[in-house]
UniProtKB/Swiss-Prot annotation:
Belongs to the glycosyl hydrolase 1 family. Transmembrane segments: none annotated. The active site is at 164 (proton donor), 349 (nucleophile). Keywords: Carbohydrate metabolism, Cellulose degradation, Glycosidase, Hydrolase, Polysaccharide degradation. Monomer. It comes from the Bacteria. It catalyses: Hydrolysis of (1->4)-linkages in (1->4)-beta-D-glucans, to remove successive glucose units; Hydrolysis of terminal, non-reducing beta-D-glucosyl residues with release of beta-D-glucose. Broad substrate specificity glycosidase. Releases glucose from soluble glucooligomers, with a preference for longer oligomers; acts more readily on cellotetraose than on cellobiose. Displays similar activities towards the disaccharides lactose and cellobiose. Is also able to hydrolyze various aryl-beta-glycosides in vitro. GO terms for cellular component: cytosol. InterPro entries: Glyco_hydro_1, Glyco_hydro_1_AS, Glyco_hydro_1_beta-glucosidase, Glyco_hydro_1_N_CS, Glycoside_hydrolase_SF. This is 1,4-beta-D-glucan glucohydrolase. Its EC number is 3.2.1.74, 3.2.1.21. GO terms for biological process: cellulose catabolic process.
Length: 425
């Protein structure tokens, strides 16, 4: 029997736009995901987050489920436009009330709240001013952060500035698959830089306002393996690791510079005097959050813009088409310790989508998900044995939910949601 350290936190994770529904209720403003999902062609089947899991009305039942399954921590995000409908300025008290109820109920049940300040639902009114491409967003984000710290920081001690900033910048502003749906490499890399500036300003405000809490940031990660021993394939894998994984952001945060292969590729797309901001970006953080789902084999490809292409392997895949590579979570954890040696690390998301069906007995037999989680948790344990200061593990996700551009077609929940009845199974 593998034992995890005393005090290790087992948790579940969600995000506001993916579960809440009622996006405009009680004075909330529109988010970019509201406008993006309401634009035909952006999301599979024309799905939107208008109802989602109706968590806005069923939050109490959902927290009871968290308690029932024995999770000791709950990672959730705050909807920026619920708190500041215009993005800055006037605070919406009803938005604060909603999250206050959630926080107080979690604490009554001895469940530790982990709050993600930004999980992709930017106020639409700020997008009209350029959104993440506007340098002023660092100040807008600091103002929003301050409102949260001042209202919730007395009770919430674990904070995450940004969820997966790479996805915000690249999938939202270069690939155009996520809100705001842009395809501009200059905007994408200005966004990378402004996300780092916003993160740093938020950390600074946190140090002034929350005296005994911890703050970190969360990254998406894939485990990139080279297709051969050839130098150019190894370099391709190194580039993907630096660009797609934690180094793109942790290198500036810990060392005050972008990683070498990223700079080689993207120097011309970054703001002209980006170096001037690096001193401010280099702020101490208390923990690093890592999300991990899948591994990839890559090779050098002279015809691709980044000189890299993916090599498909004959491996089991999830419903997302993602290859299942459990040892990748071990190498990502070991890598972050060796490269940056953070004080604390959390796995802030790990999980899988499968084609879940309700059986005749009214249950969902998701043995494939159980196998996926078990295999990854074994690798997480292995990383702890090798000295990674891992303090907790969060499953993605508590509930089936709005899976961004995939709509409701992909189910990640350890609890099944029947969207016709909102029944939790």
């Amino acid at each position: 029997m593998k034992k995890f350290p005393e005090g290790f936190l087992w948790g579940v994770a969600t995000a506001s736009y993916q579960i809440e529904g009622s996006p405009l209720a009680d004075g909330a403003g529109m988010s970019i995901w509201h406008t993006f999902s309401h634009t035909p062609g952006n999301v599979k089947n024309g799905d939107t987050g208008d109802v989602a899991c109706d968590h806005y009305n069923r939050w109490k039942e959902d927290i009871e489920i968290i308690e029932k399954i024995g999770a000791k921590a709950y990672r959730f995000s705050i909807s920026w436009p619920r708190i500041l409908p215009e993005g800055t300025g006037k605070v919406n008290q009803k938005g604060l009330d909603f999250y206050n109820r959630i926080i107080d109920t979690l604490l009554e049940k001895n469940i530790t709240p982990f709050i993600t300040i930004y999980h992709w639902d930017l106020p639409f009114s700020l997008q009209l001013k350029g959104g993440w491409a506007n340098r002023d967003i660092a100040d807008w984000f600091a103002e929003y952060s301050r409102v949260l710290f001042e209202n919730f920081g007395d009770r919430v001690k674990h904070w995450i500035t940004l969820n997966e900033p790479w996805v915000v910048a690249i999938v939202g502003h270069l690939y155009g698959v996520h809100a705001p749906g842009m395809k501009d490499i200059y905007v994408a890399f200005h966004t990378v830089h402004n996300l780092l500036r916003a993160h740093a300003k938020s950390v600074k405000v946190f140090r002034e306002t929350v005296k005994d809490g911890k703050i970190g940031i969360v990254f998406n990660n894939g485990y990139f393996e080279p297709a051969s021993e050839r130098e150019e394939d190894i370099r391709a894998a190194r580039f993907m690791h630096q660009f797609n994984n934690y180094p793109l952001f942790l290198n500036p945060i810990y060392r005050g510079e972008y990683p070498d292969l990223v700079l080689e590729f993207a120097r011309e797309y970054l703001p002209r005097n980006y170096e001037d901001d690096m001193e401010e970006i280099k702020q101490e953080i208390d923990f690093v959050g890592l999300n991990y789902y899948s591994g990839h084999m890559v090779k050098y490809d002279p015809n691709s813009p980044a000189r890299v292409s993916f090599v498909e392997r004959n491996l089991p895949k999830t419903a997302m088409g993602w290859e299942i590579v459990p040892e990748g979570i071990y190498w990502i954890l070991k890598g972050v310790k060796e490269e940056y040696n953070p004080q604390e690390v959390y796995i802030t998301e790990n999980g899988a989508a499968f084609d879940d069906v309700v059986s005749e007995g009214g249950k969902v037999h998701d043995q494939n998900r159980i196998d996926y989680l078990r295999a990854h948790i074994e690798q997480v344990w292995r990383a702890i044995q090798d000295g990674v200061p891992l303090k907790g593990y969060f499953v993605w996700s508590l509930l089936d939910n709005f899976e961004w551009a995939e709509g409701y077609s992909k189910r990640f929940g350890i609890v099944y949601v029947d969207y016709n009845t909102q029944k939790r199974i």
